[in-house]
Design a protein with these regions (language model features):
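Residue-level marker for buried hydrophobic side chains located in beta-strands
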Residues: 29-30, 140, 259-262
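FAD/FMN-dependent oxidoreductases across multiple families
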Residues: 186-188, 196, 206-273, 279
Length: 345
């Protein structure tokens, strides 16, 4: 079967995983990254069993699993610590035969970069995307995030980043809390997960941009260990960003028979379901598999197969995450909490 060449725009999780999958299929691959170096902030990615299956098919499952921790025993709580419900992690584990896992972003990126290097894929840093026509590649993959230049070139401004009206903070505490899950208040919430021994991943969402001291005050009366996390971690290591998603949903993840989008470039979502990295990995593996099955001579058919497999699924996840965000940040917490209590144990 005739093999071809691909250029991947963006060296994030989705872009590197796509490059690995295409290279393992025998394609010549280059990765362009506009930044001069990759950021190494230490937030955690949750990986659902389906995403772990995709990593297995890419030959990366064991390496990632060795750097991850299982996620179990998480609860949804009120600010006073009252448990409202359990997250369905154990149910997912029983059905899938493996637990959801959490891995720090730097550790996941280290695995991907090591495999990219081993496969002989070049990553060209400080290189902006100038459009598909001058690349000389058979396939152009847009993995360049929510502000994707590849997406804009293919679809114009019909879908664009849209703010949801809240601000997120994320960070890593230098101790294990032993208390995991999310705590929901009025218009705001706080989450904690394991990430690696001796550390805890945390994230918070508030209605407006605030400084570090204001954030601490926002959660000062909440149950332990939330105030301690904010008091004992260095604000200079915290990351703040306005929560956005891609709206409206794209009509396709592919364009013109030679361009495909993966990850946030295709379906950027709010982080409430913790599926951003998962969907990017599923996109990457599905695209590489479709291209390998059809070959260079049937690239339009390969992209159509990829779009058929991934678009509806990923867009449903994005919609679910946005809907959950509205529910969690509700201004009527009593009604919301009452509904949560009705969830099965």
């Amino acid at each position: 079967m005739e093999r071809g060449s691909a250029i991947v725009i963006g060296a994030g999780v989705g872009g590197l995983a796509t490059a690995i999958g295409l290279r393992r299929a025998g394609w010549a691959v280059r990765v362009l990254e506009r930044r001069t170096e990759l950021e190494r902030y230490g937030t955690a990615f949750g990986l659902h069993p389906t995403a772990q299956d995709a990593l297995d098919r890419l030959g990366l499952g064991a390496a990632v699993g060795a750097r991850a921790v299982p996620y179990r025993g998480a609860r949804i709580r009120r600010p006073d610590g009252t448990v409202l419900a359990a997250l369905p992690l154990e149910r997912i584990e029983r059905r899938a035969g493996r637990p959801e896992i959490l891995v720090s972003r730097p550790r996941l990126m280290d695995v991907l970069l090591a495999e990219v290097d081993r496969c002989g894929v070049s990553v060209e840093y400080g290189t902006a995307f100038g459009g598909p026509d001058g690349t000389g590649a058979d396939l152009v993959v847009g993995a360049d995030g929510i502000n994707s230049a590849v997406r804009t070139g293919a679809f114009g401004e019909r879908s664009a980043p849209r703010e949801v009206g809240t601000v997120a903070w994320i960070g890593i505490a230098g101790f294990e809390t032993g208390v995991y899950g999310e705590t929901w208040g009025r218009g705001r919430f706080f989450g904690m997960t394991p990430v690696e021994p001796g550390r805890t991943n945390w994230y918070a969402t508030v209605p407006e941009a605030t400084g570090a001291e204001e954030l601490r005050e926002s959660f000062a009366g909440w149950h332990d260990p939330i105030p301690r996390i904010l008091a004992e971690t260095d604000p200079s290591t915290w990351i703040r960003y306005r929560m956005r998603h891609l709206y409206p949903a794209l009509p396709a993840f592919v364009h013109g028979g030679r361009t495909a989008l993966v990850g946030d470039a295709a379906h950027a979502m709010t982080p409430n379901l913790g599926q951003g990295a998962c969907t990017a990995l599923l996109d990457a593996e599905a695209l590489a598999r479709a291209v390998a099955a059809h070959g260079r001579g049937a690239l339009p058919a390969a992209l159509a197969a990829y779009d058929a497999e991934r678009r509806r699924s990923a867009q449903w996840v994005a919609l679910g995450s946005r809907t959950l965000h509205r529910f969690v940040t509700a201004r009527r917490p009593a009604l919301r909490d009452g509904l949560v209590r009705l969830l099965p144990a």
